[in-house]
Amino acid sequence: QGFASGLWPACLAIMASTVPRERIGLAMGIMQGGMTAGGVLGPFFGGALAELFSMRMTFFIGGAALAVITLLILFFIHEPPRKEQKKAAAAREKTSLLKIPVVQRMLLCAGVVQLTILLQQPVMPMYIGELQGSMDRIVFVTGIVFSVVGVSGVIASPLWGVIGQKWGYRPALYTALAGTACFGMIQAIPDTLVPFAVWRFIGGLTFAGIFPAINAVLTMSTPPEDRGRIFGLSYAAQQVGSVIGPLVGGGMAMYLPLKSVIFLGGFILLPLVIFLWYMRPKNEENSHGSPAQLR
């Protein structure tokens, strides 16, 4: 699982190194849409395969799929010449990526956003059961409620990439974060299941813009030879959030109503977007994550 987790940062690094600079937003949006689609379809196909064959066979099929992906990347994906990258790296002064202010903020943002996602995961089945008034078919219903966010993400991710290209990736990030915060808090208001699912779908439309914008800013703020490292750091920050989120959510559920956990998932993003807005570069030149200033 650890080796497989490195596939996504590597794919992002290859994409960022090959796509023209002016199209990076759309590329990141499409990548995020593809990942979201996989997140929606994966559990569906996994469950279907387990029913048709067996759980053990599902692992073999998943491993075979990864092997096919490896072969496709090995033979059909070509990286830029490494010699040019080495010369560029030798010509510039080596700087730790973690010392670059914009990188620090984007890593913080990635970690906190991932924390808010996983914060709700431990309580979601119980909360959905509370909304529908019973625990009947709770696994199936929970899967549907989770999948609506994925569906909206597939629709909206490429559009957010285009918005970032047109108006700037940082403004797109602030807008997506603010929208996700608002809709995340609104999700805690309904007392029945259908309105809750509808608000999750709407929130997914804004959430879809967060990670493409983060990845685009990181791409524009780092030299090509550091793309692999920066996306590895970004993914590591997300995994830290993935560890902390369920612990916080489960701990809160022991003492507070489940609605409080759902509400907090959106509320946490408000101070984050305020902080990012306050710390933003004050000149338009840097709104796209210009590597000239790295602020």
Over which residues does each language-model region extend?
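Helix-to-loop junctions at the C-terminal end of transmembrane segments
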Residues: 156-168
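Paired small-residue
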Residues: 194-202
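Cytoplasmic helix-loop-helix junction between adjacent transmembrane helices
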Residues: 1-35
